[in-house]
Amino acid sequence: MLSSRAAAFTGRRLASTLPPVPRKKSHGVRRLLAKAVVATSLFYAGGLTLSAYNDKANELFVEHVPFGEELVERWEDWTSLRRPGRRMIDARRVDEISRDFRAAATPEATPVVVRPLVQLQLPELQMQGSSPVLEALVNNVNDVVVALNARALELPEDTASALSSVYGEIVHSIQALNASLDQEFATEVESRTGKAISSVQEQLEVEYKQRELALAEQYIQNFEVFKSQLQKATAEQLETELKAHEQALLARHRNEVAQLSIRQVEEFNKIIEKKLDQERNGRLAKLSELNSAVESLAPVLDRLELRAVKNECVTQLSTLISDIQGKLSRGGDEPLDLSSDLQRLTLLADILPRPKRCCSEGPALLDVAMAELQAKAQAPVASNEQLYNRWQLLQPELKTTSLLPPNAGFLGHLTAKLFSMLLFTKEGFSTTQDMDAVTARIAENLRLNKLDCALEEAVNMKGWSRKSADAWVDLARRRLEVLTLLDVIEAEVKTL
């Protein structure tokens, strides 16, 4: 047991007095973790050794230290595997000692050495400015120390001194670890701070250069924009001033020209007045008599002009009326539109000078005839050929209507239609008053262009025959009225 304790203490001292690993300037976090692992291993090794020789320490280590129970169990299993050889050696020594005791007649009493016991009091670990990892380790160590001091363990003096020395070495190692960590942390902070400062300086220099380039480019752009705007504004202002100056010069030139022309006119008037004054008593002495003679000729010239205008209007009116009558006499297969001719006729009638009315207050015959002609010629006027053709188409119906009895019904109409087919169509002039003779006379008058006689015969018809011929009578009456009005206007124009 003593040899195993000595071996354990020796291993712990060797483990606690191992030289520190030389530091490297790089990998500070790795060194920090390695030192934390070493300190934790030393702490667990010391606690495991103490728990192997003291039950109270064993109980505190198992209850308060994480993974303490598992480590103690593994330690006991490992020691149990090493003990069988020693048990055999101890059994042999016990047999030898028992044989020696039996051989001795009177056994000698071995003195019992009583070693004084000392109460174990370990100081708490004080650490300031440690890292969070070491601070947790220090807190765990202080918890174990407080628990050991609370148990008031009484140990032999050499054991207590050995534990105190081991604890002191652990404290020294933790403090050295803390100091090295602080130094490495300061070194690492300084190196990283230098790197950060250098990188920040480089970044600031790059940003400064970029900002300087951007500002220079922006300044150039703003300068170019300002330059273009200034050039544009200057050009516009210069153009405006040039235009204003040009306008002022033109106005001044016009004023000077106007003044010069006024002076020239005044001088010319003076010259004319002077010449007139000179000639007034000479060749222009009878100028007033000449003026009165010219004034006496003015009414004669007006009358001549009025007569010429009247003759021209009468000539054009006669020509236009002759043209309209020629159109109506020529005829054709389509109705005649006289609107344009009537507009010209009305215009000439308005221009025509006429004598003043002295006896009658009513409108002149020419105006009445023109108004009636405008009213009658609004619709197209049928030609003589159209009237003749329409009358030829109307004759069979007139034959049928002439055979109808009074109040004829359907049978009467049918009978009249059949008998009308048996009648012979008369031609030429006939003196009888039957329907065939009347239609023959009307057709002959139309053929001979005697529209008034034909219309008179048609108007004198009675009954269904007159009713059937109403449309033809209207067309013939419109043509006859237009021709009559043209004759009236022509006669009135000839009397002017």
Curated annotation (Swiss-Prot):
The chain's Mitochondrial matrix topological domains, given as residue ranges, are 15-35
Q: How does it sit in the membrane?
A: Single-pass membrane protein
Q: Name one GO cellular component term.
A: mitochondrial crista
One example of a Gene Ontology biological process annotation: protein import into mitochondrial intermembrane space
User: Would I find Coiled coil among this entry's keywords?
Assistant: yes
Residue stretches in coiled coil: 216-261
Question: Where exactly are the transmembrane stretches of this chain?
Answer: 36-53
Q: Where in the cell is it found?
A: Mitochondrion inner membrane
Q: Which InterPro entries match?
A: MIC60
Source species, domain of life: Eukaryota
Q: Where is the transit peptide?
A: 1-14
Family to which the UniProt record says this protein belongs: Belongs to the MICOS complex subunit Mic60 family.
Question: Assembly and interactions?
Answer: Component of the mitochondrial contact site and cristae organizing system (MICOS) complex.
Which PANTHER family does the UniProt entry name for this protein? MICOS COMPLEX SUBUNIT MIC60, MITOFILIN
The entry's function note states:
Component of the MICOS complex, a large protein complex of the mitochondrial inner membrane that plays crucial roles in the maintenance of crista junctions, inner membrane architecture, and formation of contact sites to the outer membrane. Plays a role in keeping cristae membranes connected to the inner boundary membrane. Also promotes protein import via the mitochondrial intermembrane space assembly (MIA) pathway.
- Protein name as annotated: MICOS complex subunit MIC60
